[in-house]
A protein has these predicted regions:
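Hydrophobic alpha-helical segments that form the core
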Residues: 109, 114, 158-179, 191-198
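Hydrophobic alpha-helical connector segments
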Residues: 64, 78-109, 162-169
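Short, basic, alpha-helical segments at the C-terminal edge of helix-turn-helix-like DNA-binding modules
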Residues: 67-74
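Amphipathic alpha-helical packing segments from all-alpha helical-bundle domains
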Residues: 108, 125-152, 164-167, 191-194
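Helix-turn-helix
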Residues: 18, 22, 26-60, 64
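Amphipathic C-terminal alpha-helical segment
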Residues: 101-104, 149, 169-186, 199-209
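Amphipathic alpha-helical segments used for helix-helix packing
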Residues: 90, 105-127
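N-terminal intrinsically disordered/low-complexity leader segments
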Residues: 1-14, 207-211
Length: 211
């Protein structure tokens, strides 16, 4: 009996992952509000009622989609950068990994979080908005932390504001993502890297450490 139960749970987990992998791609293009049990069932090996049974409500589906997108984001941006030394080297590795994540269309619609943060930015008190905010705050705080480590190590000037550096880097990355999608111009990623490199060098970074 236990073996049968474990087998059903394993199949359910696999099905849930398959549905969510489709959901993050769809939401990156059309937004989280566009998700529906029926549409996701059409592209997964289950019917609409089975998808509904996995999540219970549309909000739960949206929350699970944000969580899955965060996992994929971590896999493609955070994990590759961990091989670099903490501080300036890792900060730069994060910038490079992010540009590759967007450029390679890990999500069909470019950066998943760019799509959904615009969709939910004015919906205060919404659980899905809270999840999107938490994901973005986690990313930004990680950038700030690496910037602070760089300052502490003397890799950036002592008067550098890590939060300002993180803000400017984020702005460059987001602009590259948006313009690449709108204009079909992948050259914007190199321009973003050039601009990010310049802002770090202006704050005392060693150009040789920045690729």
């Amino acid at each position: 009996m236990t073996t049968q139960t474990d087998g059903r749970r394993l199949r359910g987990d696999r099905t849930r992952r398959t549905v969510l992998d489709g959901a993050v791609q769809e939401a990156s293009v059309r937004g989280l509000d566009a998700l529906s049990f029926g549409a996701l069932a059409a592209s997964a090996p289950v019917n609409k009622s089975a998808v509904a049974g996995l999540f219970g409500s549309k909000e739960n589906l949206q929350l699970a989609t944000v969580e899955r997108a965060s996992e994929i984001y971590t896999e493609h941006v955070i994990v590759p950068a961990r091989s670099a030394e903490r501080g300036l080297a890792r900060l730069w590795a994060l910038v490079v990994a992010w540009t590759e994540y967007s450029r390679s269309r890990v999500f069909r619609g470019g950066c998943f979080f760019r799509t959904v943060e615009v969709e939910f930015d004015m919906r205060e008190g919404c659980a899905v908005r809270d999840a999107v905010v938490a994901a973005q705050e986690s990313w930004e705080s990680y950038l700030v932390h690496q910037g602070q480590l760089a300052v502490d190590a003397g890799e950036l000037a002592a008067d550098t504001d890590p939060a300002q550096v993180a803000f400017e880097i984020n702005a460059l990355l987001n602009a590259a993502n948006d313009r690449s999608l709108l204009l079909g111009d992948d050259g914007v990623y190199e321009r973003a890297l050039t601009a990010a490199r310049s802002l770090l060098v202006a704050r005392g970074a060693d150009r040789a450490m920045l690729g």
